[in-house]
A protein has these predicted regions:
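Positions in alpha-helical segments
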Residues: 21, 36, 49, 87-91, ...
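Compositionally biased, charge-rich terminal segments
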Residues: 1-12, 157-173
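A hydrophobic, helix-centered structural microdomain
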Residues: 2-71, 178-216
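Soluble extracytoplasmic domains of inner/organellar membrane proteins
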Residues: 148-153, 162, 168-170, 179-184
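A short, structured surface patch at a secondary-structure boundary
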Residues: 82-139, 179-182
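Generic recognition of short, well-ordered alpha-helical interface segments
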Residues: 10, 14, 61, 84-87, ...
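Short, hydrophobic secondary-structure boundary micro-motifs
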Residues: 35, 49-50, 78, 115-117, ...
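Short, glycine-rich, amphipathic interfacial segments at transmembrane boundaries or analogous
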Residues: 49-85, 143-161
Length: 216
């Protein structure tokens, strides 16, 4: 049984990632074109947002999304806060998860998988405990177990527990379940809290507060 469990993540999962990402990119190509034009109109250039993220074994890669913020600056030429730069169209892209469509190309190139722990920002790396670091034992995903169990309405510890549960139990059955539930949640727009609006505390700040509290 243990041998069968290893066959899927080592060989079959990558094959499915390639096949499904190619199919999705082809089928969604009209949406890519329309969203690209609208981003250019409402956000300006560039169309894509690029940011380094930790992948499997904490290896850094560039993750791409459609831009959801403008380049608005104050009178001194400094960018306004994230909350002030997210317009209605940007919020629409985030709540519908359309901003994440370019990640399919990261899946195709092998940097990500369709299912896995979500890739978080590089600045969080020093703040994971030994258990939480295991979320990087597999490739990050477009969606994951945490995304179908509360998404970013969860506390950080809860999210990481779901990530670790996935890492320890990855299987075709689990991936299929996560994909099906993700599609349902996207259409229902459930469990969505916009990052960059002050409603979600960054993990590094959250963990710093915990450490300071424990050291008192």
């Amino acid at each position: 049984m243990q041998k069968n469990k290893k066959v899927y993540p080592r060989y079959i999962k990558r094959l499915l990632d390639i096949v499904l990402s190619i199919i999705a990119i082809i089928l969604l190509s009209p949406i890519y074109i329309v969203v690209s034009i609208l981003v250019l109109i409402f956000m300006g250039w560039p169309i894509l947002f690029k940011q380094p993220r930790p992948g499997k074994n904490e290896k850094i890669f560039n993750m791409y999304k459609f831009r959801t913020m403008t380049n608005k600056k104050n009178k001194d030429g400094v960018l306004l806060s994230d909350e002030e730069r997210i317009n209605k169209f940007g919020k629409f892209l985030r709540t519908t998860s359309l901003d994440e469509l370019p990640e399919l190309f990261c899946i195709l190139t092998g940097k990500m998988s369709i299912v896995g722990p979500r890739p978080l920002v590089v600045s969080y790396l020093p703040y994971y405990n030994d258990r939480e670091k295991h979320r990087h034992d597999v490739k990050p995903g477009l969606t994951g177990l945490a995304q179908i169990n509360g998404r970013n309405t969860l506390q950080w510890e809860e999210r990481f527990e779901y990530d670790i549960e996935y890492v320890n139990n990855v299987s075709f059955k689990m991936d299929l379940k996560i994909i099906i539930y993700t599609i349902k949640k996207v259409f229902k727009r459930e469990d969505i809290v916009l990052s960059g609006t002050g409603k979600i505390e960054n993990f590094n700040i959250y963990r710093k507060k915990q450490l300071e509290k424990n050291n008192k």
